[in-house]
């Protein structure tokens, strides 16, 4: 695109992209219309493109001369950013407390299986390994997500490299991935999400490499990554579906005429077979879980979903990922990787239509950051200070990211200070992932508070029971967070293991609990009265910074079951 002069008094900037495939070191289009990469590396192809005067592509080093040596090379910058992220995560690993889901995964790690109601088996297996290798302290649990998320940062830079980007492109892509709040937040606790982001980003890297180098055998490796991803979180199926449709919709469909993508797809589903067998054996509980999903998720209109994308990926990254999307979809030099842009568009639409949580789309952003980094590096605007503007933008990414992270995702501020700031900015700024009342602090922090206080309150009630009732008492909770907390902290207080009807705790059943004496936490009184003749409120759980639905909870002591607890167990079933 060229902006023409607007009269003698004013000369508008010139914006141009190279228009010939040969400028990027590509051969002529194949018979299907898809350009096939030449033998040159992505870096050499980008250099050829940048050599054209007025092409709009600029070299990161003028005249082809290296500046600064290895210490400021693209690889070195990726290493520096990776070390920064790893250091930040490890230094904050012990802050606040155990996240709700971590307590659940710890419980699952003691009951390893090929599947669970609300998640596939990988995260429980990883948790079991971490506890075996490092223990179950907060720093120990947070080592793996820190390493995994650091890998995602590096992969974002490598995607930019594969797209032909140099030092600026790779560093910008990695930096944006580092500071994006949703990506950074899930790096601070052990969960499926950090792994999910890694598998998506690795899949995107392989996809770009396959398209770039015409190496169809890499679809096997792509299938392996998707298979591991399916063992972690089934939403990666959306990514796989989007890749397939994007290939069909572009000249890259020629890959589907080879055996390799089909073998890769078959390989990924082989990984899923044990999980599918577990579903069959247990009556497909995950289907019921997803059927109840809308109860838990905040309902968003398309504009609200888009606004949450902008806010939770950080507003300062908006120009970068929009530039990346534009480059992939509309710029001629990006046509080889057009399927990547289509993947993002389809995922956006799918999650809006399916009412997915806003952070489901987060794993798709590193590939846009990479393309945006290439656009920032290669897109020439005829402004005298454009180079300074580009450097200033990257500096803003770093500074704003460093300032905002402690306020939104990193557990570093004193909780009193965090609560004061949260109140000043009106809670979570309207960003809610779940249909739950907002706390004094954001949900990703609030769900780390109150667990041990709850256990201590239950222990106080337990100690008031006569010895004969203590010997037979069970602890029934309303959700897996409370049950996981009882199981984890309870032994220090001499408490028995918890039972619950929530998600996989329901499948684990009431165990040997007779129901003659039960301490019930956060279970509706009406439900208890349908099962027990004697329902007595004994205490109330209170916590200052926890989620409101975990505060002021009644603790009941119930006795005299109307039927054996095993028979009444379905009344407590809660797949949500």
Show where each model-derived region lies.
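Short helix- or helix-capping micro-motifs
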Residues: 81-82, 173-181, 226, 230, ...
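Membrane-interface alpha helices of multi-pass inner-membrane proteins
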Residues: 111, 174, 206, 218-233, ...
């Amino acid at each position: 695109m060229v902006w023409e002069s607007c009269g003698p008094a004013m000369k508008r900037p010139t914006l141009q992209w190279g228009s010939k495939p040969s400028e990027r070191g590509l051969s002529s289009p194949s018979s299907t219309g898809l350009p096939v990469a030449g033998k040159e590396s992505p870096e050499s192809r980008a250099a050829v493109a940048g050599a054209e005067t007025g092409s709009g592509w600029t070299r990161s080093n003028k005249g082809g001369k290296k500046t600064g040596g290895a210490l400021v090379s693209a690889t070195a910058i990726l290493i520096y950013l990776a070390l920064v992220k790893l250091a930040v995560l490890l230094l904050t690993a012990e802050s606040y407390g155990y996240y709700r889901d971590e307590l659940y995964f710890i419980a699952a790690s003691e009951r390893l299986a090929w599947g669970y109601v609300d998640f596939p088996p990988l995260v429980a297996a990883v948790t079991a390994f971490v506890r075996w290798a490092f223990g179950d302290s907060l720093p120990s649990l947070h080592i793996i997500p820190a390493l995994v998320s650091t890998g995602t940062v590096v992969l974002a830079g490598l995607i930019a490299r594969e797209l032909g980007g140099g030092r600026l492109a790779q560093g910008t892509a990695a930096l944006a991935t580092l500071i994006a709040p949703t990506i950074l937040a899930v790096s601070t606790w052990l969960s499926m999400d950090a792994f999910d982001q890694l598998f998506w980003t690795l899949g995107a890297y392989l996809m770009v490499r396959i398209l770039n180098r015409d190496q169809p055998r890499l679809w096997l490796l792509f299938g392996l990554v998707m298979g591991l991803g399916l063992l972690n979180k089934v939403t990666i199926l959306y990514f796989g579906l989007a890749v397939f449709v994007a290939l069909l919709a572009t000249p890259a469909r020629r890959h589907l005429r080879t055996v390799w993508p089909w073998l890769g797809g078959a390989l990924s589903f082989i990984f899923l077979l044990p999980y599918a067998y577990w579903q069959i054996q247990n009556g497909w509980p995950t289907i019921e879980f997803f059927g109840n999903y809308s109860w838990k998720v905040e309902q968003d209109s398309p504009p609200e979903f888009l606004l949450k994308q902008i806010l939770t990926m950080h507003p300062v990254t908006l120009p970068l990922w929009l530039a990346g999307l534009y480059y992939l979809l509309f710029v001629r030099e990006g046509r080889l990787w057009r399927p990547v842009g289509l993947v993002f568009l389809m995922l956006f639409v799918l999650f809006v239509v399916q009412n997915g949580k806003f952070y489901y789309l987060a794993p798709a952003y590193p590939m846009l950051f990479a393309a945006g980094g290439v656009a920032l590096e290669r897109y020439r605007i005829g402004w005298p200070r454009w180079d300074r503007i580009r450097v200033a933008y990257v500096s803003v990414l770093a500074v704003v990211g460093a300032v905002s992270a402690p306020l939104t995702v990193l557990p570093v501020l004193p909780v009193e200070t965090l609560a004061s700031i949260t109140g000043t900015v009106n809670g979570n700024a309207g960003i809610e992932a779940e249909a739950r009342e907002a706390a004094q602090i954001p949900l990703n922090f609030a769900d780390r508070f109150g667990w041990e206080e709850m256990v201590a309150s239950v222990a106080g009630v337990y100690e008031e029971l006569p010895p004969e009732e203590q010997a037979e008492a069970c602890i029934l909770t309303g959700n897996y967070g409370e049950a996981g907390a009882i199981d984890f902290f309870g032994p220090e207080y001499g408490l028995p293991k918890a039972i619950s009807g929530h998600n996989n705790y329901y499948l684990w059943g009431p165990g040997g609990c007779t129901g003659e004496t039960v301490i019930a936490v956060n279970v509706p009184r009406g439900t208890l009265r349908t099962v027990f003749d004697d329902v007595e409120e004994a205490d109330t759980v209170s916590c200052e910074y926890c989620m409101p639905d975990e505060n002021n909870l009644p603790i009941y002591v119930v006795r005299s079951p109307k039927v054996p607890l095993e028979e009444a167990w379905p009344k407590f079933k809660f797949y949500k």
